[in-house]
């Protein structure tokens, strides 16, 4: 018996993995997660997550059109997420977006994950891309940290999942609309730059 946590509050708990989200959820309801219970609760969470994981998943406004435009302009696109690879691919398939990406890596794709630069560098390697010819777009401190550590310019979106104000993350640019991305990316990395 715990109180329900409003969706807007949950939004601020997302971004550092399911275990951290559970810890934050427990703290929000007034009681810390009991030591040793995390594995059991993770199993329960993942069971419910797998049953209804796509019910509320939608791209943010302008994302699909912008991805299509960037791809048509000759940019390679990738996803570098800490979400496990399998669920990431399932979501992309349900949304009909998997064909837009040249590489997709999850938190279980390499021995390391964001903010370790090996995660982003490994993703770039799958596309035969160099850090100087890439741009990271993200919504969290982990995204900015991995980009910085890998030597990749980074653009942060202002409407993502972070507990820190996005303008304090240290990104090179902050955008309020995904539609603004195309012009900024073209300035940072001209099409065809290797």
Q: Positions of the model-derived regions?
A:
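A broad detector of the eukaryotic-type serine/threonine protein kinase catalytic domain
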Residues: 1, 26-27, 50, 54, ...
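PIN/NYN-family metal-dependent endoribonuclease catalytic core
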Residues: 11-15
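A metal-dependent, Asp-based hydrolase signature
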Residues: 16-51, 61-64, 69
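Structured helix-beta-strand junction loops
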Residues: 16-17, 73-74, 169
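Short polybasic/polar patches that bind polyanions
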Residues: 1, 23, 27, 71, ...
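Short, acidic loop-to-helix structural element flanking the phosphoryl-transfer center
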Residues: 47-79, 85-90, 114-117
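Asp-based, Mg2+/Mn2+-dependent phosphohydrolase catalytic module
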Residues: 7-8, 32, 47, 84-194
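Conserved phosphoryl-transfer catalytic core
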Residues: 1-8, 19, 29
């Amino acid at each position: 018996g715990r109180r329900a946590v409003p969706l807007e509050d949950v939004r601020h708990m997302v971004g550092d993995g399911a275990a951290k989200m559970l810890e934050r959820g427990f703290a929000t309801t007034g009681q810390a997660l009991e030591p040793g219970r995390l594995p059991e609760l993770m199993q329960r969470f993942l069971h419910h997550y797998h049953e209804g994981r796509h019910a509320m998943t939608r791209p943010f406004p302008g994302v699909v059109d912008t991805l299509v435009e960037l791809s048509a302009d000759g940019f390679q696109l990738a996803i570098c997420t800490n979400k496990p690879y399998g669920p990431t691919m399932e979501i992309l398939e349900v949304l009909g977006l998997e064909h837009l990406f040249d590489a997709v890596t999850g938190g279980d794709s390499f021995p390391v994950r964001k903010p370790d630069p090996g995660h982003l560098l490994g993703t770039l390697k799958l596309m035969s891309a160099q850090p100087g010819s890439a741009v990271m777009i993200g919504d969290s401190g982990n995204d900015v940290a991995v980009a910085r550590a890998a030597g990749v310019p980074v653009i942060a979106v202002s409407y993502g999942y972070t507990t820190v104000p996005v303008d304090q993350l240290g990104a090179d640019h902050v955008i309020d609309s995904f539609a603004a991305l195309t012009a900024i990316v073209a300035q940072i990395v001209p099409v065809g730059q290797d």
